[in-house]
Design a protein with these regions (language model features):
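Hydrophobic core segments of alpha-helical transmembrane domains in multi-pass membrane transport
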Residues: 8-9, 16, 47, 52, ...
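Generic transmembrane alpha-helix signature in multi-pass membrane proteins
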Residues: 24-32, 91-95, 107-110, 115-128
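C-terminal ends of transmembrane helices
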Residues: 25-39, 86-100, 152-163
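Cytoplasmic-side transmembrane-helix entry/capping segments in multi-pass membrane proteins
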Residues: 38-49, 73-78, 100-112, 167-173
Length: 195
């Protein structure tokens, strides 16, 4: 494992293989929580935290499952780990940052079923990453999610403020068009070569 490998994993997770724009994972909170920048950043930070921890714990769980010959239980075990981590984040936010807890509302418990969080754990196993690579991929994948939801929320806020949208595009339709255009912009990174 070299710094070049970690850099390639990081750039891939943030830009070229962004969970939102390239792999289309985590779309529900992306569309649901992106109306305000503050809420979007809070959700992105929570997802980043859970993805980083889930990557670490799921790597260790996978070692135990492989040693016991229970590889077929990976998905179930990963979901249980993610559910526990989300409960921890929910209790932490409720106690320490109640305004963010209220703003995230129903979307916070939905991190448990966020396919981006489960996807990072499964992709770590599929790509045969070691512990450090798994954690780096989880954290930078979360940062890519945070970047995507932040940029999308910023554009959505500006579109709401401007009010120049055709009536047929008000609300959700213009959000989908914006997400599509942003995905095209991120696809421009797919030709990026790292060393």
């Amino acid at each position: 494992m070299s710094v070049t490998t970690l850099l390639a994993i990081s750039l891939g997770a943030i830009l070229t293989n962004n969970f939102i724009f390239a792999q289309f994972l985590g779309i529900c909170p992306f569309l649901g929580v992106s109306k305000k920048i503050d809420t979007a950043v809070g959700m992105g930070a929570a997802v980043t935290f859970v993805m980083g921890l889930a990557s670490a714990f799921c790597y260790l769980i996978n070692l135990v499952l492989v040693a016991l010959g229970l590889e077929f239980m990976q998905t179930v075990a990963y979901i249980l780990v993610i559910a526990g981590l989300v409960q921890f984040v929910e209790m932490f936010l409720k106690k320490n940052i109640p305004t963010l807890y209220t703003a995230l509302g129903v979307y916070l418990p939905l991190i448990t079923t966020n396919c981006a969080v489960l996807g990072v754990a499964l992709l770590n196993t599929q790509n045969d990453y070691n512990f450090i690579e798994s954690v780096v991929y989880g954290i930078t994948g979360g940062l890519g999610f945070l970047l995507a939801i932040f940029l999308f929320a910023a554009v959505r806020e500006q579109l709401e403020i401007s009010g120049d949208n055709p009536k047929a595009f008000d609300g959700f339709p213009i959000a989908l068009v914006t997400a599509g255009l942003m995905a095209l912009a991120f696809m421009g990174f797919s030709g990026l070569k790292v060393w």
